């Protein structure tokens, strides 16, 4: 019996020890649960911060890429249209050459002078063409207010709103209008 009592006491002590260990384990689990929830909350906050910063980074990267493209386009435009002002000034000289050629009478005395003027005129046109300046085709074309400047309108047997006479040639450099053509348009 003594042994049974002693075994019984050992079992009770073991039970009490298990109970106290169980309580300590439950308390530890509850504190760990609280720590785990805190960590999950911190993780969620850090994830939100990361997503916000990453989104800002992507926007900045897109803005920078667009900026680089815009600068490259502007540099290209500067190169393409660098001759625009001088070409515009030369158009008046071309007009004067055309007037000189048209008004000069064709005689033996004037023939060499006319050939010289025509040669210089052609060289000037070729140089401008080499640098992207082109004449705007207008004669017998439909009137386009972006390309033509109508100074007269006249009754005509053909279709209306067509260019029937070019009073002053128009020119463009690449896709930009230097000077619209002054035209007479049919009614």
Swiss-Prot record:
Disulfide bonds: none annotated. GO terms for cellular component: cytoplasm. It is found in: Cytoplasm. It comes from the Bacteria. Pfam families: GrpE (PF01025). SUPFAM superfamilies: Coiled-coil domain of nucleotide exchange factor GrpE (SSF58014), Head domain of nucleotide exchange factor GrpE (SSF51064). The keyword Chaperone applies. Its main location: cytoplasm. GO terms for biological process: protein folding. CDD domains: GrpE. Residues 1-40 are annotated as: Disordered. Homodimer. Participates actively in the response to hyperosmotic and heat shock by preventing the aggregation of stress-denatured proteins, in association with DnaK and GrpE. It is the nucleotide exchange factor for DnaK and may function as a thermosensor. Unfolded proteins bind initially to DnaJ; upon interaction with the DnaJ-bound protein, DnaK hydrolyzes its bound ATP, resulting in the formation of a stable complex. GrpE releases ADP from DnaK; ATP binding to DnaK triggers the release of the substrate protein, thus completing the reaction cycle. This is Protein GrpE. It comes from Alkaliphilus oremlandii (strain OhILAs). The gene is grpE.
